[in-house]
Amino acid sequence: MGKVITVWGSPGSGKSMFSCILAKALTRDKRKAIIINAEISVPMLPVWLPEQIIQTNASVGQVLSSVEIDTSLVAGHVTVLKSYPFIGVMGYAAGENPLSYPEVKYAMVLQLVNAAARLVDFVILYCSSNMTNVFTPAAIESGDLVIRILTPDLKGVNYLKAHQPLLGDGRFHYDQHMTFAGMARPFHALDEMGHIIGGWDGLLPYGKEIDRCATEGGMFQAIKYCNPKYTASLNKVLDALEQMELADDAAEDDVSETEHFEEETADE
């Protein structure tokens, strides 16, 4: 099973760009990643891939409105980057709107995530800021690593205060989320805002070149323009994932040793 990374947070905090940069970093060694977004108010397929012609039947809406979701259905609706075949994306297609599909069910999101994690090494769930979109709470519940990105201003702080009570259930692991200051600029009161929310794990500063990549439809090229603080935050995420993988490997070794011991005992 692949690792599931959930990216959520306040509007305008740079979640979509971070998801693309993270996907590029995770696939440097030719491992595979899928980014999934289910925010129909802004269909992401034409934003991610403005130069690729994408048919409507590639939409994630077709998957989420299915009776049952399995790996073959998911694989058939992943759009692979022509310029970088280790990354696939799933989202809504150009022209789709909230009336294009039936209401998404929480259980179907969980099925989608589970199926996607069986296909690739990493699944990045890029969430809407709107918690009434069931994809967001389901993605937070599903995440092996959850990344919370907030603008370091009053909007970001009050977004968090408003949504924290909705994530109080233990299945959301609220206290284990990594928190980053997104679109941080020199004039932001980072220390004060960090004190209010309980501290930052790192900064994802605003950069003109990164912004230009988003504007020009080259989001997957932006990793080349990350400044040292952005890169340090990205490395924290990569380190956290590496620690998880090491822990999983150790657990598998323990299970194998236990099974081997039990077999030897049975033979005696």
PLM features: residue spans?
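P-loop/Walker A phosphate-binding loop and immediately adjacent motor/lid segment at beta-alpha junctions
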Residues: 103-110, 161-187, 222-225
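Beta-strand-loop-alpha "switch" segments that mediate conformational coupling across diverse proteins
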Residues: 182-224
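P-loop/Walker-type NTP enzyme "switch/lid" segment
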Residues: 35-118
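Inter-motif core of Ras-like GTPase G domains
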Residues: 134-153
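Conserved beta-strand segments of the P-loop GTPase G domain that flank and frequently precede/overlap
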Residues: 7, 36, 91-92, 124-126, ...
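NTP-binding/hydrolysis catalytic cores, primarily Walker-type P-loop NTPases
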Residues: 216-268
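Walker A/P-loop phosphate-binding motif and the immediately C-terminal alpha-helix
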Residues: 2-41, 45, 116
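Well-ordered beta-strand positions
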Residues: 122, 145, 199-202
